[in-house]
Every structure is written in structure tokens, then in C-alpha cells.
């Protein structure tokens, strides 16, 4: 799945994701892309083991957003895995 997100011309941004901390029955491994550029690979399988939300920021290289008013943020599960439960997706200034 993916989201089209507004950068407002900013280049010093992070992708902020909110995850549910307890996800014992899923194997959550996935890649995050910004306009088809790999931002990071994430493995949240059994990561927190808590019944709270967890927020993680991923710094976006300025060249991924330079000169753009919007970017597509795409989540792609690894083969045989899942993206997992994401409850918030935001672009934030660093």
C-alpha cells in the first residue's frame, strides 16, 4: 500500500510511523520506499512486546524530496511476511 504525501517544498524531513507494540502473531518485515527509492528495511517481528503505541522516525535523505511538492510513500512486505499494523503515517520536519 502507499500514500501520496505533501512535502510543502521542505527537504529536511522524516517519515514518522506509529506502530502497535504488541503483534505477537505476525512476522512483520517490510521495505519503505520514497518515490521508488528505498528508504529503509524494517523488521518489527516481536520488537516491543508492549500494549502501547510506539512511534519511530526515519530520516529522509534530502535528495529524495528536493524540488518536490509531494512524494509517494510505499510499504512493501518481504516475501512471506507482512507489513504489520501501522496506525499513523506523517512527514515531519527535523
Q: Which residues fall in each region the model found?
A:
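Beta-strand-rich ligand-recognition modules
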Residues: 1-12, 18-94
Amino acid at each position: 500500500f502507499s500514500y501520496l504525501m505533501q512535502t510543502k517544498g521542505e527537504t529536511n524531513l522524516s517519515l514518522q510511523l506509529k506502530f502497535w507494540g504488541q503483534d505477537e502473531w505476525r512476522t512483520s518485515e517490510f521495505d519503505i520506499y520514497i518515490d521508488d527509492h528505498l528508504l529503509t528495511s524494517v523488521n518489527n517481528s516481536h520488537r516491543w512486546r508492549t500494549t502501547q503505541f510506539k512511534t519511530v522516525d526515519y530520516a529522509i535523505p534530502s535528495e529524495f524530496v528536493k524540488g518536490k511538492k509531494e512524494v509517494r510513500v510505499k510499504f512493501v512486505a518481504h516475501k512471506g511476511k507482512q507489513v504489520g499494523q501501522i496506525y499513523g503515517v506523517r512527514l515531519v520536519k527535523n
